[in-house]
Amino acid sequence: MTLAARKIRLLMELRRNGITDTAVLRAIEQVPREAFVPAPFMDQAYENLALPIERGQTLSQPQVVARMTQALGAAGVGKVLEVGTGSGYQTAVLSRLCRRVYSVERYRELIGDAERRFRALRLHNVVPKVGDGWNGWPEQAPFPRIIVTAAPPDVQGSLVDQLAEGGVLVVPVGRRSRRQELLRLTRKNDTVVEETLGPVRFVPLISGLPEEAPKPAATIRYSGPTGWSLA
């Protein structure tokens, strides 16, 4: 079966599973998931499965991407904050719906790979950066929409504070060893209305930035009568 046929099969499965927003389905149809899948898993690009990527992270299951995107309601929105760029697939789907996507990722390696994919796909409305997702992106706040693609143990006040009036935050909450729930929070008149959208399973949202690997020490070698040299 060709990739195109597999994509059609996946879209039909998403419709059967409750994804009814035509804008979301169109965005998923327009984004080539194979561009975000590691080579060993290319034959599974359009299976409804989560797939491993670098740094112990995952490329989310298409059903989960569609479900979160539908819950977010990003079509026609001016800007969206995404916490957790990962492979960039969710980012790319969002870029087909809103005018600009600001995306924060703690791993420099992942953001570099994602940026190369964005350039290859000519996604010029994506603004990625390396940063601590727990802090959001206060310089660009407030945001009418925020989506978090890793699970904090509870809702982060720093992200809620960056929601615009009437804004929506979609976030999986809970510890990995316990039950996680997908939540949708809507800010109305300085209060937050919370809805539970069902169980999910995500990698944890980790605070802070990873330490850079130390540079290897220079090797000192004896070079004979002329003395010592650094390799």
Spans of features found by a protein language model:
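Class I SAM-dependent transferase core
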Residues: M1-L81, T85, Y89-V93, L97, ...
